Amino acid sequence: YYEDWKHVVFQGKVAKVLNKYVVLDQTAFYPTSGGQLHDIGFIEGMYGKDEVVDIFKQGSVIVHVLKETPTCKVGEDVKGFIDFTRRKQLAQHHSATHIVGAAARIVLGEHINQASAKKTVEKAHIDLTHYDMISEEKLKEIEDKANWLIQQKVPIQLKFYPRTEAEQTFGMGIYQGGAVPGKELRIVNITGYDVQCCGGTHLLNTGDAEAIKILKANKVQDGIVRVTFVAGDAARAQQKGEQNVLEETAKLLQCKKTQVPARAQELFELWKQAVKKKKQPTSLELKATEEFLGSEKDMLVKVCEIYKTTPEHIVKTTERFLSELKETHESEKK
């Protein structure tokens, strides 16, 4: 996996078996490390197929954790199969972490460094060194610049260097997120934009990240801002989810998607007047037709501001406002 994230089928020999733990003489399974989750998959031998549910590193030894008691025996030749979809998503999130960091440096300044990071299948985050909270406008600029870097299909060079040579060639900025042990360092170089030592599974060019969508930013401590994002398939799923939220809300408000923010504002004002202030409006009909000119993400942000909620609660909040408004109106008529 150091050279090619697509290396998901390999052959090896069983070196040790202890309960559900198996060690092979060589493996392509990635262990949880560097803020990145482990691979999963199967080890297949002459006696059956064993499901691998966890991978960890004990010293220099990579240990495979099986779901059940292993069928493989010490000395047996086996074949390993790694879950390709999971590996791809984790590689996309890991390389996207470097891409987002590079984009943030372009937008916010050269003081930006990675303090730490985490990459899971569902999402990833990068903790950036920055003196202030990042505004929504700057987040949008960072997202746009990250996707621009994807469109450029910048080569990502993965190479091991002796520590001294790496430091002399690339400078001490390679140590982002803390010092790395060992006489040799694996350098991940997004040519011209970001260089750091890293041991994770990485793409071979930025284009393979496909898309990056920033979800939020929050301050975790003084001088550290956490940016949470998704990439690749996870980014497309997030975008699809946002589209579904807007479509469902538009149906509830009986309007076009672009009119949702205006209708949501109108509904909120009616609800506040009737339910909170106990003043019944003359009509419950929503008439606002003003069209929102921003992106779907900006539309969701606007509706969240109006409702004072989060995107996943927009539909339920709309349903609640409509229901409570109707109930209050009907009780007043009685």
What do the PLM-derived regions correspond to, one by one?
Residues 111, 121, 207-210, 215-334:
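Terminal appendage regions of diverse proteins
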